[in-house]
Amino acid sequence: MGAVKSRTITSADVDADEQLQHPHSHAHHHSMRNGHQHNGSISSGTLQKQDLRYDIGCSSQYQHVRQPSLRSRSQQPMPTTDELDRRFAKVLASMDLPPDKAKLLRNYDDEKKWDMICDQEMVQAKDPPSHYLSKLRTYLDPKASRSHRLYLFYFLCQKRKMVGESTSTQVLRDLEISLRTNHIEWVKEFLDDTNQGLDALVDYLSFRLQMMRHEQRLQGVLCASEERLNLTNGGDGGEIVMGNSSSVSPGGGGGLLSHGNSTGHGLANGTLDSRQQHTMSYGFLRPTIADALDSPSLKRRSRHIAKLNMGAATDDIHVSIMCLRAIMNNKYGFNMVIQHREAINCIALSLIHKSLRTKALVLELLAAICLVKGGHEIILGSFDNFKDVCQEKRRFQTLMEYFMNFEAFNIDFMVACMQFMNIVVHSVEDMNYRVHLQYEFTALGLDKYLERIRLTESEELKVQISAYLDNVFDVAALMEDSETKTSALERVQELEDQLEREIDRNSEFLYKYAELESESLTLKTEREQLAMIRQKLEEELTVMQRMLQHNEQELKKRDTLLHTKNMELQTLSRSLPRSASSGDGSLANGGLMAGSTSGAASLTLPPPPPPMPASPTASSAAPPPPPPPAPPAPPPPPGFSPLGSPSGSLASTAPSPPHAPPMLSSFQPPPPPVAGFMPAPDGAMTIKRKVPTKYKLPTLNWIALKPNQVRGTIFNELDDEKIFKQIDFNEFEERFKIGIGGALRNGSNGTEVDGSLQSSKRFKRPDNVSLLEHTRLRNIAISRRKLGMPIDDVIAAIHSLDLKKLSLENVELLQKMVPTDAEVKSYKEYIIERKDQQLLTEEDKFMLQLSRVERISSKLAIMNYMGNFVDSVHLISPQVQSIAGASTSLKQSRKFKAVLEIVLAFGNYLNSNKRGPAYGFKLQSLDTLIDTKSTDKRSSLLHYIVATIRAKFPELLNFESELYGTDKAASVALENVVADVQELEKGMDLVRKEAELRVKGAQTHILRDFLNNSEDKLKKIKSDLRHAQEAFKECVEYFGDSSRNADAAAFFALIVRFTRAFKQHDQENEQRLRLEKAAALAASKKENDQVLMRNKVNQKKQQLPSNGALSLQEAVINELKSKAHSVREKKLLQQDEVYNGALEDILLGLKSEPYRRADAVRRSQRRRIDNNRLSRTLEEMDC
């Protein structure tokens, strides 16, 4: 194998076998003979004897250094001051700190300096850089694995011993750890001209990339050949198994790198056209596979890898990238890698690695290089080289293939890929170039793919996608903005001219205004006095109205009580003569007898006589109670009617007992007391009888109590028998009946009822006809059940506009049920065709009746308006009053005026030198008091103003106490209130027109009463609204704003925000003062306890020496990490500004916050505003 040159892979290296098939060329021997002329550097990849001796000699100073133990370090005596300063200066030089940080460490005391020296001496390099470089160059030497020549036998054996048992992957891992953990001088020694470590590492990475690409192409050829064999043999071909496939990419990576080979690409997709099937045969394909497997270059590479115990190419490439990352974390190494074009090309070519983790690492490094000045051009050049080597049709084509057509989803790779594309497109300053790069990715399908994955569940990927879309340039939108800007500038010029004319006119009116102002002040004073008098009168009127309402309620209560007493007196006067003839026995019964007597007194029929033999003519009189039974709980009277009907029409339907006595005439004397109605003894319950019904009724699914469970509860005191006499249940049964088989007659059993029901089901009812749609029919049926009123009553209530008969809820239901024009037309056609209306469904009959009502929509709208008028007035009135009150209080507030005066003073003090003094400011400027920060950025201008007011004007701290109702007014939109009042006015006009259309009669008194009661209220609320508008207008103009486009909610919200911010900043000032006092007290105590604290620190250092060194350097490390904030500003870092650890800070900054341009933030805010406007416009159109 020939020597591996220190150069990148170009398009001439597409076939890697050409470089490896001529190992004995004349140039090779010439380079070996002249190897000593290059100052000890090895450019041809071979080692000389003096190089071997140099490595062994140099390594002695590292291998024989003994590491001091913890005990020996603690027992080491502190040297003299001069020696301590000399050694400490050496430690500072190795740390390579900025001057300010080095000065901070030089101010440490001697004890801390000695601790840092001891900790730094503990960290010593185990091996020199040449130890690792000699091994890498041995792996690169093609003759290290061939020892057939006798004169090189001893020298080559020594090189194999130098490699040892460790693999190349392990050597690279050790090198990466050394580069990352050793001090800076070690890294500088690795990169100096003597060792040339970067060149050796890049040469080895290039060598391993060639081998991996060769393995990937071989795997692609094998896969394509296997598919051809399968297609040729009809799918029965066998598999070809490689002897050493562990280091070959199984993912078919070669297919992605061979876009120029159309035949291989077609075979990778599993398809063959007819021409290829005709020309290719099994006998032609077989030798090609044998040549690929038995090629001399492949055998030499395999033998070289096996003899030198080299690791897998994929592992070596990944660890080599990690080594380059560690080098780039050093400021010298970063600049060397940037200037080493072959290194960047090798990093970019590592994207063909099969591991997604390696791809993500490569993309992160490339993205970080783009953020350094001049790095963007280098990265694009590396991808141009990638395009030539991998034979891409377009740049970034392979990267987009990996991004869009992944075999396994890896979130780190997707985020790194999205981050790289965002930075490589949008980190350039030239806008045209940004648009060009943006379109380059758009042509590869990035925009469509981002639209597909924008709803991904990964928050990190969402953030990167959002950052890219925020940075995107929309050229069409920019053109539109440019045209809008031109027209806006023209409009500004016109407005400026118009403003000049208006200023001239305004100066003329100033004189008139001065004359009218004095008169206005006089009128305002009189109006304020009148307003105070009016307020007092309104308060008195309110008190009198409350007293009047209270008296009316008391009068109604007394009237009701008097009416009740009068009814009781009439009842007693009717029952006294009858009860006197019955003797004292009838008055001796308990509570149930008294209740039954009072209930029977309201009936026109006399009480039933004592029991007598049964008579068939007893249907005209109420049945008598049974004779007094012997058991303690007698049954109830058999003929007792549950409905208590005075006419006794239901008495004949009640079942009579088998031995019912006959009824006497209604003129016989009253019977003796009924035993069944006497109170039951203690511990016993009266047995309730079953209530007969005419129809079958639904069942109430309740949980009933047993008689023994009722004892001691409220149900023991209830008597539902009395309710049966007071309620007419006939209508109840008509409303809730579920059977159609007729009434349940006396003496009929369940079998007969069931038979009648079953017989009725045998006859199929004719299907009803409906002119409504299915959904409309169902909605009408549901609304009709909710309505629960006959159609005649509904129509009568609509004609009379009576909200007592038709509730507001039913009116709203009917507004939804109003027939449409199409439905009215269909019903008219149905009637014209003289079809049977009885065949229509109940819902269609209902809708037919509604369609016949004239102007039903207008009438229902009037009823809805009348029903909601009071609520609307009660809702609008407080809003109007809050605006008026807030405007008046804000204008009359003296404390708020003084606060604004202080703010004006501070503003003029800040701006008078630059902009000149100001005579006033708009209230929107109060929000900017928070944004004006102090020098240390810890406090704002409002903090200082609040502190000044507390110190000089403490009486102004509660200025918000004079601002009444500003919180409520901030939540009220005056435009909406005006619109609501206008809607009330329109509704009132409809009521007036309806009253004028109707003739004088009984149906107009409702409208007249409503107009009489509501017009004054509407006039009052309109007057209050005008007063509120005038007060708000005067308030806005009083504070210097224009009242033309003023928004009440925004205006008062500004005042509320200022008052809240004032309180918050006052609390922060107080808390800051408390903390400063506590800090001062702690500082005073710290001086007294300094000796004790130093002893405790020393004890902790002896116990944990390693942690002690970290604690001493904690301040320096934190300051070094603070430089990452410059990365967050998304400004490109100059190459001379790169510091140690800058690469890690850039990567951490990109993970914490994606790359966004300043113009991208403005565009995203503009898009958000446009989207909000569009959504509001759509909502208004929907409404």
UniProtKB/Swiss-Prot annotation:
GO biological process: axon extension; cell migration; cortical actin cytoskeleton organization; mushroom body development; ommatidial rotation; regulation of cell shape
Residue ranges with Basic residues bias: 23-36
Phosphoserine sites (modified residues): 225
Domain GBD/FH3: 76-559
The keyword Phosphoprotein is assigned to this record: yes
Domain DAD: from-to ranges: 1136-1169
Keywords attached to this entry: Phosphoprotein
Keyword Phosphoprotein: yes
GO cellular component: cytosol
Effect of loss of the gene: Lethal; shows planar cell polarity defects with abnormal ommatidial orientation. RNAi-mediated knockdown in the eye results in planar cell polarity defects with ommatidia showing defective rotation.
Matches recorded under InterPro entries: ARM-like, ARM-type_fold, DAD_dom, FH2_Formin, FH2_Formin_sf, FH3_dom, FMNL_animal, GBD/FH3_dom
Low complexity: compositionally biased ranges: 641-654
The FH2 domain, residue ranges: 687-1088
Biased composition (Pro residues): 605-614, 622-640
SMART domains: Drf_FH3 (SM01139), Drf_GBD (SM01140), FH2 (SM00498)
Alphabetical list of Gene3D superfamilies matching this protein: Formin, FH2 domain, Leucine-rich Repeat Variant
Molecular-function GO terms, alphabetical: actin filament binding; GTPase binding; small GTPase binding
Residue stretches of biased makeup (Polar residues): 63-79, 572-584
Annotated segments matching region Disordered: 1-44, 63-82, 572-681
Transmembrane segments: none
Subunit structure: Self-associates. Interacts (via GBD/FH3 domain) with Cdc42; the interaction is stronger with the GTP bound form of Cdc42.
PANTHER family in the cross-refs: FORMIN-LIKE PROTEIN
Function as written in the Swiss-Prot or TrEMBL entry: Together with Cdc42, involved in establishment of planar cell polarity in the developing compound eye by contributing to ommatidial rotation. Together with DAAM and Cdc42, has a role in neuronal development of mushroom bodies.
Family: Belongs to the formin homology family.
Record note on domains: The DAD domain regulates activation via by an autoinhibitory interaction with the GBD/FH3 domain. This autoinhibition is released upon competitive binding of an activated GTPase. The release of DAD allows the FH2 domain to then nucleate and elongate nonbranched actin filaments.
Record's protein name: Formin-like protein
Lineage of the species this protein comes from: Eukaryota, Metazoa, Ecdysozoa, Arthropoda, Hexapoda
Gene name of the record: Frl
